[in-house]
């Protein structure tokens, strides 16, 4: 299957009308049934809104049915709309979340950001009350050697060790470098062997089904190695992103095996209109 990049998933961002529709989701959607986990939202798709009004955006996400969110670091994602988060103290940010009755235990951090100042990233995470620090990619070469993969894993194990000292779980998303091949083997699978299972957990991007990476297969193959997942609907017939429950994915199987994989939280990550349309299905899904 041909690769579908993250940028392609979000290039058709919702219009203001779609935003309005997204924000009008009813209060009856505030409960989630899959594994007893709250319905989560990655804030990347609403980064423009966050840049303009973070407190208002969080309240609106809560009204739409999301009970927990995943942020992006104000340093590593400063150019993407998250720089403004840096103006809040941890107490202020926690109050904004608390007032909206929304929790946040996870955030994305750029690998280069952590290379330059991991201590600063950890300090911000602790101040905000996070327990998970996720890196989207180790940013290795697109045609890596086995040594490239080993070096990347060694470096990230050390970062995981530093995070663990602070009581934070380091995590790794699967994008770009993680989806390459090395000597006929998937780099992603090699990383499961090279990364310390205690120091680094994995966050699965469900949309990588478009590249042949099946979430349920990985949760079963590597029990206990995951901590979270990014949820996107995907139609094999149209090869397009769809609302969860309006696609061809077996979500009952995905969530059932997610328990085996160790999933502690999940975050819907699509354009606003599709995120809104996914909430009722997730609320009613029984596994």
Q: Which residue ranges define each predicted feature?
A:
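Flexible loop residues that form catalytic
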Residues: 44, 74, 112, 138, ...
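A short acidic, helix-capping loop that chelates divalent metal ions and anchors anionic groups
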Residues: 77-81, 141-145, 237-241
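Active-site acidic/histidine proton-transfer and metal-coordination neighborhood
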Residues: 13-15, 21, 75, 96, ...
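Glycine-rich, proline-tolerant flexible connector loops at the mouths of alpha/beta enzymes
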Residues: 70-92
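Conserved beta-strand positions
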Residues: 41, 71, 107, 135, ...
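Histidine-acidic metal/acid-base catalytic patches
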Residues: 2-3, 7-24, 28-40, 47-67, ...
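Active-site mouth loops of central-metabolism enzymes
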Residues: 40-52, 106-115
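Flexible, glycine- and charge-enriched loops at secondary-structure boundaries
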Residues: 54, 83-86, 90, 142-149, ...
């Amino acid at each position: 299957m041909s690769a579908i990049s993250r940028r392609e998933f979000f290039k058709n961002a919702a219009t203001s009308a779609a935003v309005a529709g997204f924000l009008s989701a009813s209060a009856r959607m505030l409960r989630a049934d899959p594994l007893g986990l709250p319905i989560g939202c990655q804030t990347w798709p609403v980064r423009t809104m966050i840049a303009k009004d973070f407190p208002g955006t969080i309240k609106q996400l809560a009204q739409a049915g999301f009970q927990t969110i995943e942020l992006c670091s104000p340093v590593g994602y400063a150019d993407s709309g998250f720089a403004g988060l840096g103006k809040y103290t941890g107490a202020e940010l926690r109050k904004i979340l608390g007032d909206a009755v929304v929790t946040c235990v996870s955030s994305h951090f750029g690998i280069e950001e952590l290379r330059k100042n991991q201590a600063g990233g950890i300090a911000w995470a602790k101040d905000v009350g996070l327990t998970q620090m996720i890196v989207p990619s180790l940013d290795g070469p697109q045609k890596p050697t086995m040594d490239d993969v080993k070096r990347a894993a060694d470096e990230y194990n050390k970062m995981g060790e530093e995070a663990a000292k602070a009581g934070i779980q380091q995590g790794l998303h699967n994008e770009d470098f993680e989806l390459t091949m090395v000597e006929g083997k998937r780099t992603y699978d090699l990383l499961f062997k090279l990364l310390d299972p205690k120091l680094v957990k994995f966050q699965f991007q469900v949309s990588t089904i478009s590249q042949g990476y099946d979430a349920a297969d990985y949760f079963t193959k590597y029990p206990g190695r995951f901590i979270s997942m990014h949820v996107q609907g995907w139609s094999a017939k149209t090869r397009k992103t769809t609302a969860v429950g309006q696609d061809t994915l077996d979500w009952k199987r995905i969530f059932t095996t997610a328990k085996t994989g160790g999933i502690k939280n999940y975050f819907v990550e699509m354009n606003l209109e599709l995120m809104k349309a996914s909430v009722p299905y997730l609320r009613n899904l029984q596994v």
